[in-house]
Amino acid sequence: MSASNSFETALLGLIITNVDAANVGDAAGLQNSATAGVFWISLTVSPGHTEAGDQTTNETAYTNYARQDEARNTTQWTVTNDTADNDNAIGFPTGGASGATLFGFGLGSDTSGAGNLFIIGDLTATLAVSSGITPSFAAGALDVVCA
């Protein structure tokens, strides 16, 4: 089963930027949230991902690590075709005494703990975090693809 390109774009717009997905059911379509809220972005230490689990599944625990929030709006994200990209850099805390090798990312519901994990993906290259290393996604580098 597959969705059309236009529906993939509409779904990403609704989920990532809180923009209505028009013409689903009626002209108004699937409506946005009254309050857009944020996604909490996490970093993971395991290659590949499982669709089971929560935000803590394979989440890194390097010294000083914390999830970072990103608003669900068109100021923070751009949706083009089947891909959503971050419009601004997303920085994480600088590594401390204990490090980790990062393989992936997640978008979820909670600032900490076992929140809902909505979207998972792999980094384009692994990143070894140690003391003084600051993980980040440059603007346009975090791709969420609906294909």
Tell where the protein language model's regions lie, with residue ranges:
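Small cysteine-rich, disulfide-bonded extracellular modules of the LU/uPAR three-finger superfamily
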Residues: 1-104, 109-147
